[in-house]
């Protein structure tokens, strides 16, 4: 007599996927507000501090390249465990750093680990979560990431206020990452929790799960896929990449600005944490806006609000109430960013071949992550030759250019998605 397995519940993914994601994201976001302070303490100027902060997104970009192949070879769970180990090594290097560039090397390793962890958790959901629950599970995954982005800075603010040690958030990062690794390490085999999954052969004959095959295919023939889809990637891909420039600019410019106006570390982390709450509150609304009113209804307001906010910020450095302006614009940037949560992934899905999306999505991810990596480098370069105010204004101008590209190219490349009402 056979028994019918119990119906699947998203709660089954809470421990193997959602809790480690929450902890890993909290660890990553805990130290971001203090990178410029630590870099400055090690002898860096503002320009170099911006570049060092940007090593996180550069590491993510570089980590994107081999991660799919590695996950297909060692499995999703093992890849997440190795990612936590690499992140711990990066955090340890940052804690022990004696030069700005040693700090940058540690942050770069954390970026590589972040890329691998993100792909592995996506592959895990694809492999083990039934199709009927997949959209909700991916939405919940995004929510866990944003929850960690709230938890990290708020926890960092508390330990900074208690200790006065700028390195304390890196200790937090180590603690959160160890906790994520422990959850993954001591959980039972996923196939005992979710049931045995169907395995297939990849192009080399290696046995993989559906999720492992998907992320492996994303990286296969990357540059050939970029060349094949060059028109769309140079137009809409670059426009989406500029959204990532604005987002990365927000993550880097706000802590740099706080250092330049003499704000306390704990206050900076607290403001960034509260801004993350504002961002998080708009997470679900943005998806509804995109589905009901089209992609431009989310992307254009985001780029307009964030661009104008950066441009206004550039004029406030000498104002009497500079702290108040900083807080107000940090919240405005959070609102702008929250209005388009998921827009980059959604546009990529709109453009991808519905029968074989993985390779295009890999090229799309590489293009848009290039924007995220370029943002801090542009900011650091402009600060080096001019000032942080000019860097903020230039970021706003780039955002307005991207908005114009969105207005022109979204209707051309995604007419069906844009026509939704």
Predicted regions and their residues:
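Helix-to-loop junctions at the C-terminal end of transmembrane segments
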Residues: 63-75, 282-295, 383
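Symmetry-related core transmembrane helices of the 12-TM Major Facilitator Superfamily/SLC fold
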Residues: 169-185, 392-408
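Helix-breaking motifs and short loop linkers at transmembrane-helix boundaries and internal kinks
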Residues: 43, 75, 96-101, 294, ...
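Cytoplasmic helix-loop-helix junction between adjacent transmembrane helices
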Residues: 108-145
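Juxtamembrane intracellular "pre-TM" segments in multi-pass secondary transporters
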Residues: 2-11, 189-236, 421
């Amino acid at each position: 007599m056979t028994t019918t397995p119990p119906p699947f519940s998203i709660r089954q993914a809470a421990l193997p996927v959602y809790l480690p994601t929450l902890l890993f994201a909290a660890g990553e976001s805990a130290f971001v507000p203090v990178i410029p302070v630590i870099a400055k303490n090690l002898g860096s100027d503002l320009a170099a501090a911006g570049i060092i902060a940007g090593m996180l997104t550069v590491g993510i970009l570089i980590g994107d390249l081999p991660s799919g192949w590695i996950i297909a070879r060692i499995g999703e769970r093992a890849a997440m465990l190795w990612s936590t180990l690499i992140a711990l090594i990066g955090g340890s290097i940052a804690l022990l750093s004696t030069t700005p560039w040693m700090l940058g090397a540690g942050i770069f390793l954390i970026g590589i680990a972040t890329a691998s962890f993100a792909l592995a958790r996506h592959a895990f959901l694809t492999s083990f979560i039934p199709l009927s629950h997949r959209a909700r599970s991916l939405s919940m995954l995004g929510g866990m990431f944003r929850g960690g982005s709230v938890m990290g800075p708020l926890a960092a603010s508390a330990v900074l206020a208690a200790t006065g040690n700028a390195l304390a958030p890196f200790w937090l990062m180590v603690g959160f990452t160890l906790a994520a690794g422990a959850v993954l390490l001591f959980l039972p085999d996923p196939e005992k929790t979710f049931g045995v999954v169907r395995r297939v052969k990849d192009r080399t004959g290696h046995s993989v799960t559906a999720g492992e095959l998907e992320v492996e295919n994303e990286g296969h023939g990357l540059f050939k896929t970029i060349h094949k889809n060059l028109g769309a990637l140079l137009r809409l891909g670059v426009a989406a990449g500029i959204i990532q420039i604005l987002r990365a600019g927000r993550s880097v410019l706000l802590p740099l600005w706080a250092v330049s106006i003499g704000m306390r570390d704990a206050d900076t982390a607290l403001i960034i944490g509260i801004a993350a709450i504002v961002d998080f509150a708009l997470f679900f609304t943005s998806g509804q806006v995109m589905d009901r009113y089209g992609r431009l209804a989310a992307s254009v307001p985001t780029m307009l609000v964030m661009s104008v906010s950066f441009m206004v910020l550039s004029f406030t450095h000498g104002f009497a109430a500079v702290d108040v302006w900083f807080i107000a614009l940090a919240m405005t940037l959070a609102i702008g960013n929250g209005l388009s949560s998921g827009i980059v992934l959604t546009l990529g899905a709109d453009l991808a071949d519905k029968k074989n999306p993985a390779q295009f999505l890999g090229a799309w991810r590489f293009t848009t992550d290039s924007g995220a990596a370029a943002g801090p480098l542009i900011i650091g370069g402009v600060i080096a030759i001019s000032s942080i105010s000019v860097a903020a204004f230039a970021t706003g101008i780039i955002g307005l250019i991207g908005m114009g590209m969105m207005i022109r190219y979204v209707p051309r490349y995604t007419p069906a998605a844009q026509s939704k009402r």
